Amino acid sequence: MKKKIFLAVFLCCGMFAAMAQTAADSLAIVSADWQTEPLQKGMLYKKAVFSSLYGVPQEVSIFEISPKRYRFDVLVHNPKEETSIAARHAGAVAAINGSYFDMKAGNSVCYLRKDGVVIDTTSTGVLETVSNGDVLIKKGRLELIPWSKQEEKACTLKKGTVLASGPLMLKDGQVCDLSGTNRNFVDTKHPRSAVALTREGKILLIVVDGRRKGKAEGINIPELAHMIRVLGGEDALNLDGGGSSTLWSGELPDKGIANTPSGSAERKVANSLCVYE
């Protein structure tokens, strides 16, 4: 009997500790000293540095965009190219790196379709469980929707763009079920990129830096979902991360990169999500 009581108390304490941690992180996010800079009309650049968020130092960079003033599209880099360079050459005003790709071959390993043409399909293996969301763009307007191999096989979109990625973290304000997603991928802290839609109708392009001990140590998927939800996100999709994570604006100095890529230099990637006037 005593063992049962002890176990119950232990579990309750663990539950409340987890709740307290979440509450502490929520408070840290909303009370952070967010440095805000208007890039151009309808687009804000926000950045915050945390001494401890989800137990480690963090650096978070966000572009908050009014979709009424801008259009979105996926830019294919052929061959691979840095997000900042490809986006600038394409005439974009802002961009974030896109979905997962084959480092050697240079092609996307997630479904990519533009104006009725299938450019790439989703690879088998882990990515079939990770890639369960989709950036859907019609007439420059962006949506985030669930995705699967079944939707991929049935897709007949003639106009617009479909880019699979994932996992899908939030839908209609609710945290998505991640039980079918690769646990190591979900639970390990990495640099992360994401796109989100807010309750107010804004679009967020988000990069959380990582792999910089003592400065920015990265975030896992549940933590990223929680952070975006606290920031007002309704729908949110994880993009390729790690050394690929890059947030760029033509209005920022030097190379225009808002975050600090984790490698020694900005990585060449297969595609990017671009913002155009």
What does each model-identified segment do?
Residues V93-N97, V135-L136, E143, A196, ...:
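Structural recognition of the beta-strand scaffold that forms the well-ordered cores
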Residues Q21-D134, E143:
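Zymogen propeptides
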Residues I65-K68, L136-E143, D172, L197-G201, ...:
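Short acidic-glycine loop/turn motifs at beta-strand connectors
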Residues G106-T129, G180-E234, S244-E277:
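Conserved, well-ordered active-site substructure
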Residues V76-E81, K149-K153, V208-K213:
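Short, solvent-exposed aromatic-acidic interface loops
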Residues V60-E64, D134, L168, A194, ...:
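Conserved hydrophobic/aromatic beta-strand scaffold that supports enzyme active sites
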Residues F101-V186:
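Active-site-adjacent helix-turn-beta-strand microarchitecture at beta-sheet edges
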Residues M1-S26:
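Bacterial Sec-dependent N-terminal signal peptides
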